[in-house]
């Protein structure tokens, strides 16, 4: 919100708002999570002012609700995100992502020799470490990577 309390991104009647996305990450989330594969209206705010983050991105998707699995998979990209469920223009539910044990169908294995690049299989990574440096282990090639390497891929 600005100082004069006007919304910078239009309110939605029903759907999901993903707030507190780090700046420059919003488009990556839209692509990786295939959020644009819908006929519902999507509103995106990029580089919005944020008191706690400096700048942030925001995604609003009408008439669409994320599953708990989808919310938790956001944790690699936007660990401080808030996912709000909206009904009749009111927040009726609020959640924050927590790191899941497994991340499926979102990431791409950085190992160019991995079978997941040549076969029609969905990617699958086990989350191996939960400290500041998260390691992800590919289900197919069984190689372990820092999450930064996988995210940059």
UniProtKB/Swiss-Prot annotation:
What is one GO biological process annotated to this record?
A: 'de novo' pyrimidine nucleobase biosynthetic process
Co-factor note (free text): Binds 1 zinc ion per subunit.
Keyword entries, A-Z = Metal-binding, Pyrimidine biosynthesis, Zinc
- Provide the residue positions that the database annotates as binding Zn(2+): 109, 114, 138, 141
- Cofactors that this protein relies on: Zn(2+)
Q: What does this protein do?
A: Involved in allosteric regulation of aspartate carbamoyltransferase.
Q: How does it assemble?
A: Contains catalytic and regulatory chains.
Q: What is this protein called?
A: Aspartate carbamoyltransferase regulatory chain
Instruction: List the source organism.
Output: Klebsiella pneumoniae subsp. pneumoniae (strain ATCC 700721 / MGH 78578)
Taxonomic placement: Bacteria, Pseudomonadati, Pseudomonadota, Gammaproteobacteria, Enterobacterales
Q: Which gene encodes it?
A: pyrI
């Amino acid at each position: 919100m600005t100082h004069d309390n006007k919304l910078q991104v239009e309110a939605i009647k029903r759907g999901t708002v993903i707030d507190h996305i780090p700046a420059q990450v919003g488009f990556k989330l839209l692509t990786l999570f295939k959020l644009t594969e819908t006929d519902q209206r999507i509103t995106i705010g990029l580089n919005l002012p944020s008191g706690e983050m400096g700048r942030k991105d925001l995604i609003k998707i009408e008439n669409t609700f994320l599953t708990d699995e989808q919310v938790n998979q956001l944790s690699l990209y936007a660990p401080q995100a808030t996912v709000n469920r909206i009904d009749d223009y009111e927040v009726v539910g609020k959640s924050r992502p927590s790191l899941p044990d497994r991340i499926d169908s979102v990431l791409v294995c950085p190992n160019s020799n991995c079978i997941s690049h040549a076969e029609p299989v969905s990617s699958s990574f086990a989350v191996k470490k939960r400290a500041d440096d998260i390691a992800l282990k590919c289900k197919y090639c069984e190689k372990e990577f820092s999450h930064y390497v996988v995210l940059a891929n």
